[in-house]
UniProtKB/Swiss-Prot annotation:
Gene Ontology CC terms, in alphabetical order: collagen-containing extracellular matrix; extracellular region
Main location: secreted
Low complexity biased stretches: 1115-1126
One BP annotation, GO: extracellular matrix organization
Protein name: ADAMTS-like protein 1
Annotated Ig-like C2-type domain residues: 836-938, 1139-1241, 1261-1352, 1378-1468
Protein's cellular compartments: Secreted, Extracellular space, Extracellular matrix
Signal peptide: 1-28
Keywords, alphabetical: Disulfide bond, Extracellular matrix, Glycoprotein, Immunoglobulin domain, Repeat, Secreted, Signal
Residue ranges of the region described as Disordered: 966-991, 1114-1137
Gene that specifies this protein: Adamtsl1
InterPro entries xref list: ADAMTS/ADAMTS-like, ADAMTS_ADAMTS-like, ADAMTS_CR_3, ADAMTS_spacer1, ADAMTSL1_dom, Ig-like_dom, Ig-like_dom_sf, Ig-like_fold
Length: 1745
């Protein structure tokens, strides 16, 4: 009990020291972290349920700022709120109900799912479209979106995972489990195809169980889906799904879509009931339903707790189990339910040791608990592996693995396997001999045996194993052939042989004596023995040998002899001729022509002798590579003895074969003289014979697997100790040279290392810099510093700090740098006036002459020639020039050899090149200005710059640089003004702000006739040409001298030109632009001359006429256009063109001017001194357009005060207030018209252009009107209300809706919004909530004017999605009458005669549609004989007393201003009756039995139906009619077959065949067989039968009685039962399946089964009361006679008695303090009484202690 000892006297001092040390350590860590104080306690949760937020604060203990945040958040109260709690956002909105908004109280409803700012409190006034942001932030814990767990904290939306943790991205899986792996459910998908019949109109598609998720069904076809549900409480329900919509079915949301060709059903889930999806037959065609959903696995394995320990002391163990648990009913069920799901894997039992305390000495032995098992733990034991099933090519071997247990005495017994499941079971099967089997490897072919004609060639074929060694075991059947014929194209003139010359086996096999003998295999084959001796001693004799059919028995590895017919293939010869040498001194040469006579029929004497190789000669060299020659000898093939070479045919002698030898290099030696046989190396050209090959193939078989390491990779570090890696793979080099990558287990050698150290030397010392400190000041200019330490990385990889002298000198700029914050405010002056400012120049520069250097100020655009040096200056105020920074295309610029960033604030680019083009940005603190540089090519074209160089940031800066209005106009008009719809324009390339002026500058460069043209011709001339041109035109050189180096234009001037061009018609824009560009070029040049005082006086002319063209003002452009046809010359005809009015920009009007002259598109303000107003209107077109004027939409009434001038201008003399309005010039010709307006106001008062007409739109997607009228349109269109205003100064336009002011852009309702642009109001996707009065108010200093337009939304007639209202109306009109709803496609209602019916016309629309009824296309009122009534505002039609037959088609036509809708339905009166059809076919073709039977049909409206419908209807009387009553032709008549003569093995059966004739009277008489033979072939009268084999069951004798015990002294014995023929041939068992099979198993008496369970007496109970007492006994299986223990499995036929039980399970009396266990004395001795569990059980003993 060490934990309870009192501390030693010195302990408090040690604790105090430890606390002080800990405090220092914590304080040092805090110093590094910025001196933060500890986090404070968590605040109260912002919500009590539904997920809220809590925060904790900390404070900074330093006087400086601390890094990090001083607040942190966490989620809390993550429990669902009760249903009555309501929405948290709605509660915050309702808190403002008692606060007046604009003087009025509203009931506020929440506006959720705002995509722009989800954490602001936006609420909508109930009953209105007013949406207001009542608070910038919602309370912490409010959900950002209704369908998300993300919550708002401090006004920002924070991500919350399904685990309710902030910042967590954990999501639910498809089963609804947070961060699950999808294993608790299974994906179910399938397809159903309807196969409905007339009697069955409904069918079940699929049953979707409770808890399923993500359900989707799609029905394609005419049928209809509907639902049946059943809750866990047994409540059933049904939903017909009659219309599209979202329904709540048993607390589950159902999304149903009913489309014309299909139906779609979606349910997110989880389902709260079992759903049965059914289909209802509505059409003749089949329907298909595809479904998919995730079904929960409701039965899962659940691991139990540990069982009680197997022993009370001394060490035991305890196990767990697994039980199948039903998640729906929350109860344990049978295991079979968990086996239904393959995903369910039953957990293995767990085992752990327990009660490891030694047993008390008084016990004697430990008590056994639930299991009769002993220490140590059970373990797996395995038998040795069996032999491999295959010697190569991959086999298997197995072993037995069992669970055993060892008791205290060391006895090992087998136990159940589950007791060893706490460790993995050893494998019982493993692969073996997975190497390849030996296979044949063929060598190269030898040369042909002949030099002419036909011969043979040979090759060596070896059997090679997987290691590349020569071995046996290859199949002889797959051996490649070793010889083949070869043909030499050289003809032979004296052939000796008729047959091909046959050579012997190649040298590589014979010379090395590798010939293989015949081997016995596992397949039966002929095996010859050795030949006998020759029968004669000289001359020709014979030899014999024995041929046996043998097979190798693999299991015994012995050879067995078989009958000869068991071996396939030809049998080898058993006799052959032999020759023993010449007799009586005969000549040893034989004549082949006499062979037949000498050998007495033997084929060829030459076969006795043949050439063979007999090894090799000695190597020609001892080192350095020599040659061996194969020795060829003539041998007797029978005796294998050498013979005279004359006995072998010379032409068959094999070729000379060589092989290399002694390839090792020779050791160094002294040079030898020529007299000592020195080898002299000569040039290859001096050798006449072909040079031998220096390369030959060798060892062409697979190499054994080996390790192949790759090259080492680069070292991970350049110094300081790094790591090198390489790949080491196990590969096998194949015979063809390729490599096969193998698993590492195939390589037996040790694997080379794949890692090694490298660069094990110290690194040079280097500076380690810290982060920059904060700026030294809070405003203005300060400094930042950072510290630096000198460190070195040692070869061990450890960094160490060294002396700073060992590091290179550190630049001053590396440790200190300036910083610039906001300018400090001066007393009494706002600080904003003292921020840095850059004095930019908004100019366009175009270089026209070569110049070495040009200076520019930022803020403009420069188009320059290459090789020009450029200096960019950035003039600033209130900012130090050394702090100015430069960027190019968004990248920071630094000084280089080509670009210089000077410390004085300017940038210098040396000799421009194409890569220098771009946007240069000068930054002075927060102030930024840009300068764009572009290059001009040699052909006066701009050098293109890649588009990718522009960044979005540069575009944003360029657009932001200009004022908003100018930027809007520029982007609106700059695209496509010059390009006329080029590809670049269509791609939006010209929207690049850096390319804004490229088009107009390109036109300026291309402009002919302006002074810059002199440059192009002057600079390309050499000096001689230039002098000559000067002599011819002295003014040209003088003009060039005064040309500027750069032309300068203001950006505003070019912006005005672009804006003016954008207002011109497209057909005139190109022509108009040429004049503007020419005028611009002239103005630029004149401006330069004026600045230089060089502008010529009217009397003098310095420049030639071509150099400075006559100046033409733009205002004269229209007149030149009008006369262009006459000026063209040649009488060429102009193309036809529709009218176009020229838009022009006039100078600003002077209010004091008495006469006002202006162009269209302007505003005229009438003052008191205005005497005349002249409105110009210039139009072009072919034919020439006619001009007429209107005022406020009405034609102008001309008078002596209002005049039309000859040039179609309108002049107003002495204008008065009645003349105020919008004057419109209309130009018209045969091709079209054009119109432009001009406003005339009184003293600058606002004027609004109005239109009092009513616009009705039902088809167009957009509507555009002037304010002042009424707009009636359908939903979903875009409505634009123009409010064109005029006034001086310009009037401000304000829009109102129902007298409420509208902002610039706002959402009116979900899916609709409005936008204000240049005084116009655009309403997108209008709906009913957009109806109202829209007012435009124009106001300026002189007054205001308001005009309004009423917007009415029309809804065309359509079928409502919810049909409950009209169904209730039908039910109220006629509760018991059949009814049908009309539909656009048509419906049908089948009625009985005399019934009445209700027809409903479901319709909705705005205004309410008018309904008209028709029958068969005629008005219902004119239908003859039809009683009808119309109710329910025309929606219900009742027709009464319908008679038989079809009633035709009824239709209802609904119409209003927005459109019409026709719906149809058909009424069919069903009446079934019997109809007599035509007579059926005669029942016989002859004789006396033929009759016609009339056929009855059940009809419904002339359609045949099931006869059951006519049950009860009167049947018409019908009588059969006789037919075909005549004599039949003769025919064969046969009797039945007789019984078979044998039951098996083949028998015969017969029948009688006669020829007979049937008379018309019905009598059949026999006739001659010839009469039947003429008509048909005589049937057979005999046939074979019972051809099957005669089989029977056969069986062997009973085996020994050694089967498993099934009772006392009772075991099982077996015998074999098989099917065979009566001849003893075994057949498959199926052949005897028709016969009763004899039994193959029977019970028998066995002495080994004379066993029974023997139990000992129960031990004493471990407790006298309570729930902890138990007792045990020993249970064992013993033999009845010997009474000795035997294995327990012999007693398994009887139940095993329990070996432990609870005892003394009675409650202990609390009042009596006594011992309840017999171990209390040990408890007292071990001093365990102070522990509660021992003190309670040993109350008496512990009380005494």
């Amino acid at each position: 009990m060490e934990c309870c000892r009192r501390a030693a006297p010195g302990t408090p001092l040690l604790v105090l020291a430890f606390l002080l040390l800990s405090s220092r350590t914590a304080r040092s860590e805090e110093d590094r972290e910025g001196l933060w104080d500890a986090w404070g306690p968590w605040s109260e949760c912002s919500r009590t349920c539904g997920g809220g937020a809590s925060y904790s604060l900390r404070r900074c203990l330093s006087s400086k700022s601390c890094e990090g945040r001083n607040i942190r958040y966490r989620t809390c109260s993550n429990v669902d709120c009760p249903p009555e709690a309501g929405d948290f956002r709605a509660q915050q909105c309702s808190a403002h109900n008692d606060v007046k908004y604009h003087g009025q109280l509203y009931e506020w409803l929440p506006v959720s799912n705002d995509p722009d700012n989800p954490c602001s409190l936006k609420c909508q006034a109930k009953g209105t479209s007013l949406v207001v942001e009542l608070a910038p932030k919602v309370l912490d814990g409010t959900r950002c979106y209704t369908e998300s767990l993300d919550m708002c904290i401090s006004g920002l939306c924070q991500i919350v995972g399904c685990d309710h943790q902030l910042g967590s991205t954990v999501k639910e899986d498809n089963c609804g489990v947070c961060n699950g792996d999808g294993s608790t459910c299974r994906l179910v998908r399938g397809q159903y195809k309807s196969q409905l019949s007339a009697s069955k109109s409904d069918d079940t598609v699929v049953a979707i169980p409770y808890g399923s998720r993500h359900i989707r069904l799609v029905l394609k076809g005419p049928d209809h889906l509907y639902l049946e549900t059943k809750t866990l409480q047994g409540t059933k329900g049904e939903n017909s799904l009659s219309s599209t919509g979202i329904f709540l079915v048993d607390n589950s949301t159902v999304d149903f879509q009913k489309l014309p060709d299909k139906e779609i059903l979606r349910m997110t889930g989880p389902l709260t009931a079992d759903f049965i999806i059914k289909i209802h037959d509505l059409g003749p065609a089949d329907s298909t339903v595809q479904f998919i959903f995730y079904q929960p696995i409701i039965h899962r394995w659940r691991e139990t707790d540990f069982f009680p320990c197997s022993a009370t002391c001394g060490g035991g163990y305890q196990l767990t189990s697994a039980e199948c648990y039903d998640l729906r009913s929350n109860r344990v069920v049978a295991d079979q339910y968990c086996h239904y799901y393959p995903e369910n894997v039953k957990p293995k039992p767990k085992l752990q040791e327990c009660n490891l305390d030694p047993c008390p000495a008084s016990d004697g032995y430990k008590q056994i608990m639930p299991y009769d098992l002993y220490h140590p733990l059970p373990r797996w034991e395995a038998t040795p592996w069996t032999a491999c099933s295959s010697s190569c090519g991959g086999g298997i071997q197995s072993r037995a693995v069992s669970c055993v247990e060892e008791d205290i005495q060391g006895h090992v017994t087998s136990v159940e396997e589950w007791k060893c499941m706490y460790t993995p079971k050893m494998p019982v099967v493993q692969p073996c001999n997975i190497f390849d089997c030996p296979k044949w490897l063929a060598q190269e072919w030898s040369p042909c045996t002949v030099t002419c004609g036909q011969g043979l060639r040979y090759r060596v074929v070896l059997c090679i194993d997987h290691r590349g060694m020569h071995t046996g075991g290859c199949s002889a059947k797959t051996k490649p052939h070793i010889k083949e014929e070869c043909i030499i194209p050289t003809p032979c003139y004296k052939p000796r042989e008729k047959l091909p010359i046959e050579a012997k086996l190649p040298w590589f096999k014979q010379a090395q004596e590798l010939e293989e003998g015949a081997a016995v295999s596992e397949e039966p084959s002929f095996i010859p023995e050795a030949w006998s001796a020759c029968t004669v001693t000289c001359g020709v004799g014979t030899q014999v040998r024995i041929i046996r059919c043998q097979v190798l028995l693999p299991f015994s590895q012995s050879v067995a002899d078989l009958p000869a017919d068991e071996c396939e293939g030809p049998k080898p010869a058993s006799q052959r001729a032999c020759y023993a040498g010449p007799c009586n001194g005969e000549t040893p040469e034989f004549n082949p022509d006499n062979g037949d006579g000498l050998l007495g029929g033997l084929q060829d004497l030459d076969e006795l002798y043949d050439w063979e190789y007999e090894g090799f000669t000695k190597c020609s060299e001892s080192c350095g590579g020599g040659v061996q020659e194969a020795v060829v000898s003539c041998l007797n093939k029978q005796t294998r003895e050498l013979a005279d070479e004359n006995l072998c045919v010379t032409s068959r002698r094999p070729p000379q074969l060589l092989k290399s030898c002694n390839l090792d290099p020779c050791p160094a030696s002294h040079l030898l003289s020529r007299e000592m046989n020195e080898v002299v190396v000569l040039a290859d050209e001096l050798c006449h014979h072909p040079k031998p090959s220096t390369v030959q193939a060798c060892n062409r078989f697979n190499c054994p697997p080996a390790w192949y390491p790759a090259q080492w990779q680069l070292c991970s570090r350049t110094c300081g100790g790094g790591i090198q890696k390489r790949d080491v793979l196990c590969k096998q080099r194949m015979a063809d040279g390729s490599f096969l990558e193998l698993p590492e287990t195939f390589c037996s050698a040790s694997k080379p290392t794949s890692h090694q150290g490298c660069k094990k030397d110290d690194c040079p010392s280097e500076w380690l810099l810290s982060e920059w400190s904060e700026c030294s000041v809070s405003c203005g200019e300060g400094t930042q510093t950072r510290s630096a330490i000198c460190q070195r990385v040692l070869k061990t990889g450890v960094s160490t700090v060294v002396n700073s002298t060992l590091c290179p000198p550190l630049p001053f700029s590396s440790s200190i740098r300036p910083c610039m914050l906001a300018t400090c405010a001066r007393p009494g002056r706002p600080s904003t006036k003292h921020s840095p400012h850059i004095a930019a120049a908004r100019n366009i520069y175009i270089q026209t002459r070569r110049q070495r250097k040009l200076h520019f100020v930022v803020g403009g655009f420069a188009y320059l020639l290459p090789k020009t040096t450029v200096v960019l200056r950035c003039p600033t105020r209130r900012f130090r020039k050394p702090l100015i920074t430069w960027e190019k295309d968004g990248q920071h610029s630094i000084s280089s050899a080509h670009v210089t960033v000077a410390p004085f604030g300017y940038l210098k680019i040396h000799r421009l090149k194409p890569s220098d083009a771009g946007i240069y940005t000068c930054s002075a603190g927060p102030a930024r200005e840009q300068f764009v540089i572009k290059l001009i090519g040699g052909n006066r074209k701009l050098v293109a710059r890649p588009l990718s160089l522009w960044s979005e940031e540069e575009e944003a800066l360029q657009v932001r640089k200009t004022n908003p209005k100018e930027a809007l106009q520029t982007h609106k008009h700059q695209n496509g003004i010059f390009s006329n719809g080029s590809k670049a324009e269509k791609r939006g390339l010209t929207a690049d702000p850096g390319n804004r002026y490229d088009d107009i500058v390109s036109r300026l460069l291309e402009q002919g006739g302006w002074p810059g043209e002199l440059l192009a011709s002057w600079e390309v001339q050499d000096s001689a040409e230039r002098n000559a041109s000067s002599e011819e035109d002295p003014n040209a050189e003088q003009a060039l001298l005064h040309l500027p180096f750069t032309m300068v234009a203001e950006q505003k001037r070019l912006d005005d030109i672009l804006r003016n061009l954008s207002q011109q018609p497209e057909e005139l824009r190109d022509l108009y632009s040429k004049h503007l560009v020419a005028q611009l070029a002239q103005d630029i040049f004149r401006s330069h001359l004026e600045n230089q005082d060089l502008l010529p006086k009217p009397s003098e002319q310095r420049f030639p006429p071509m150099a400075v063209p006559a100046h033409k003002h733009v205002s004269g452009f229209s007149s030149s256009l009008r006369s262009s046809s006459g000026e063209a010359g040649g009488g060429s005809r102009r193309p036809h063109r529709k009218p176009a009015i020229l838009r022009k920009i006039s100078a600003a009007q002077q209010l004091s001017a008495s006469e006002v002259v202006t162009h269209l598109g302007q505003t005229v303000a009438l003052a008191s001194g205005t005497l005349s107003v002249l409105l110009h209107c210039e139009a072009v077109g072919n034919p020439r357009p006619t001009i007429h004027w209107t005022r406020n939409g009405e034609a102008v009434q001309f008078s002596d005060r209002i005049l039309l001038q000859p040039d179609d201008s309108l002049q107003i003399l002495a204008p008065v207030e009645a003349d105020v309005g919008f004057y419109t010039c209309n130009a018209t010709n045969a091709l079209g018209y054009d119109s432009v307006s001009i406003a005339v106001t009184l003293a600058g008062k606002p004027l609004v252009k109005t239109s009092r007409m009513t616009v009705l739109n039902t088809e167009k997607p957009t509507v555009t009107v002037d304010i002042g009228g009424t707009v009636r349109t359908v939903r979903g269109v875009n409505v634009t209300i123009n409010c064109q205003v005029a006034g001086v100064p310009e009037a401000e336009v304000t829009w109102f809706r129902n007298k409420s002011k509208l902002g610039s852009s706002h959402h009116l309702h979900e899916g609709s919004s409005h936008h204000l642009h240049e005084g116009s109001l655009l309403l997108t996707d209008v709906s009913f909530s957009d109806q109202g009065l829209y007012s435009c108010r124009a106001a300026n200093l002189h007054g205001e004017q308001t005009e309004s337009t009423q917007l009415l939304i029309l809804d065309p007639p359509q079928v409502p999605t919810q049909l409950e209202d009209i169904r209730a109306l039908l039910l109220a009109t006629g509760p018991n009458l059949p009814s049908v709803l009309m539909s656009p496609l048509g419906t049908q209602l089948v009625l009985d005669p005399g019934n009445s019916a209700l027809l409903g016309c479901p319709i909705k629309g705005h205004p309410t549609p008018n309904i008209t009824w028709f029958q068969n296309g005629q008005p219902i009122a004119t239908a003859p004989g039809l009683t009808h009534h119309i109710w329910g505002a025309g929606q219900i039609l009742r027709v009464a007393n319908l008679s038989g037959g079809p009633q035709g088609e009824f239709s209802c036509l609904a119409q209003n201003e927005a459109g019409t809708l026709l719906q149809k339905a058909s009424l069919v009166i069903q009446d079934y009756w019997w109809s007599v059809d035509r007579l059926a076919t005669c029942s016989a073709s002859c004789g006396n039995r033929g009759i016609h039977q009339p056929r009855l049909r059940c009809l419904l409206n002339t359609t045949e139906v099931d006869p059951e419908h006519c049950t009860g209807k009167p049947r018409p009387a019908v009588q059969p009619v006789a037919c075909n009553r005549r004599d039949c032709p003769s025919r064969w008549m046969v009797t039945s077959w007789s019984a078979c003569t044998r039951s098996c093995g083949g028998g015969v059966q017969t029948r009688r065949v006669t020829c007979q004739k049937l008379k018309a009277s019905g009598i059949s008489t026999p006739v001659s067989n010839d009469m039947c033979s003429q008509l048909a072939k005589r049937p057979v009268d005999t046939q074979a039968c019972n051809q099957q084999l005669c089989v029977e069951w056969a069986f062997s004798s009973w085996g020994q009685c050694n089967g498993p015990c099934i009772g006392p002294r009772l075991a099982v014995q077996h015998r074999q039962v098989f099917c065979q023929t009566r001849d003893g041939i075994t057949l498959p068992s199926e052949q005897c399946s028709a016969l009763p099979r004899p039994v193959s198993t029977q019970n028998c008496w066995s002495e080994a089964c004379s066993v029974h369970w023997r139990v000992s007496l129960w031990t004493l109970c471990t407790a006298t009361c309570g729930n902890y007492g138990f007792q045990s006994r020993r249970v064992e299986c013993v033999h009845v006679r010997t009474n000795k223990a035997v294995p327990e499995h012999l007693c398994s036929w009887g139940p095993r008695p329990a070996n432990w039980q609870r005892c003394n399970v009675t409650p202990c009396e609390n009042t009596e303090c006594r011992d309840t266990t017999r171990y209390c004395e040990k408890v007292r001795q071990l001093k365990l009484c102070q522990l509660g569990q021992f003190r309670s059980r040993c109350c008496g003993t512990c009380g005494k202690a």
